[in-house]
Design a protein with these regions (language model features):
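Short, ligand-facing micro-motifs at secondary-structure edges
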Residues: 18-23, 42-78, 92-100, 105-113, ...
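A short glycine-rich beta-alpha junction/loop motif
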Residues: 77-84, 110-131, 198, 268-277, ...
Length: 378
């Protein structure tokens, strides 16, 4: 089979995205035009702006710093200039073919700089005839379609597990008499405190900082990649997390506002950011696991956010909102522990299934890469 070698820049002439950058980040699902990034997030939201909309489709958007790519066949605007819009020379390549080919390029992007013009566009690739490209794309699409069906099934199972978790939590707390509900502040050893704000210039080294993307469903994300921030000794003392603390997301969209986590272990002095709130419970009055399970229920989170202040893109809660949240508190600590243990047994089963699903997701990603590598073997 005959191949012709080209630099990527010959196949993918670029355009700067400046003319298509969104003016406002007041996004809404009710608006028409997606705002894109080339990274994993892809669609950041939708805008109602009507000018500067890119419509010369299809194209590939290229993250100039990470080299991530996305194939786009719908009208869009962009968030920033940190990307290149890559047009496709269809005299030489089929759009999907060159997009798939980009996915198997090995490239070191560890240095924080722009890559397309100086280096990435100069990478050479061997390209077959258009007919052969079409055959390869058809085969990849066929295999990916089967893989996508399996991934859809995994996603459905994940959703069902989330529903089951909430059902377990709801059942555990449903029979507690209403007279046992008290404001959370009555069992606090240390009242809620907002975290620390530091500008970007302080980030890069120093102490780990827990941010709002670092905890979900009552737990700090396993293997969470902490950012680091330079701090004074008094800042570390004031904002340090301690084992047994509970953190709450105090500023976010309504779908994430009020999510909590129990701090179970710390490898080194760690602080929490300004969009996070921290409080400490009195273990003589309330079992920490019991409290965390309750706050992880839909109705427990509702208590935390019922007086939230809403703006266009985000909402917030304050220390008073958290302190006044009602929580059922049986006087007997042993009764609380029994409830927590029963929940834990059911949740452990869910977690095992969840881990299996995550492994299957990773295998699907590996299979996708394997399909691409085999497709482009010359």
């Amino acid at each position: 089979m005959q191949y012709t070698e080209y630099e990527l820049g010959e196949l993918l002439p670029f355009e700067q995205p400046t003319a298509y950058i969104v003016k406002s980040t007041d996004y809404s699902d009710a608006y028409a035009t997606p705002v894109l990034t080339a990274g994993k997030s892809f669609i950041l939201g939708k805008t109602n702006e009507t000018d500067g909309i890119f419509d010369q489709l299809p194209v590939i958007i290229f993250d100039d710093f990470t080299t991530a790519t996305q194939f786009v066949n719908f009208r869009f605007k962009v968030k920033s200039s940190a990307m290149k819009i890559l047009h496709i020379n269809t005299d030489l390549v089929i759009p999907k073919y060159i997009f798939y080919r980009l996915q198997i390029i090995q490239f070191d992007h560890s240095t924080h700089k722009r890559y397309w013009i100086q280096s990435y566009s100069k990478i050479k690739v061997s390209i077959p005839s258009l007919d052969e490209q079409s055959r390869i794309v058809s085969r990849i699409d066929e295999l990916f379609s089967e893989l996508d069906k399996a991934v859809d099934t995994l996603n459905t199972t994940k959703e069902q597990l989330a529903v089951y978790r909430q059902a377990v939590l709801k059942d555990a707390f449903s029979n507690i008499p209403r007279e046992m509900y008290k404001p959370l502040k009555l069992v606090m050893e240390e009242m809620p405190q907002n975290g620390l704000y530091k500008s970007k210039s302080f980030y890069g080294e120093g102490n780990p900082i827990l941010r709002i993307d670092g905890f979900y469903d009552g737990e700090v994300v396993p293997n969470y990649e902490y950012k680091r921030v330079r701090l004074k000794a008094e800042e570390i003392k004031k904002y340090a997390l301690h084992i047994g603390d509970i953190v709450v997301n105090r500023v976010n969209s309504m779908s994430y506002l009020g999510k909590c986590a129990l701090i179970r272990n710390l490898e080194e002095p760690t602080i929490f950011e300004s969009n996070v709130m921290r409080f400490r419970l009195d273990k003589q009055q309330i079992d920490l696991e019991y409290a965390m399970y309750y706050l992880s229920t839909s109705f427990g989170r509702h208590e935390l956010i019922k007086n939230a202040k809403q703006a266009v893109n985000q909402a917030s809660i304050n220390q008073t909102d958290v302190g006044n949240a009602l929580i059922p508190i049986p006087k007997d600590l042993e009764a609380q522990r029994n409830i927590a243990q029963k929940i834990s047994a059911h949740i452990a089963v869910c977690n095992n299934i969840d881990q299996g699903i995550d492994t299957a997701f990773a295998q699907a990603d590996a299979m996708r890469q394997s399909i691409l590598k085999q497709a482009f073997e010359e």
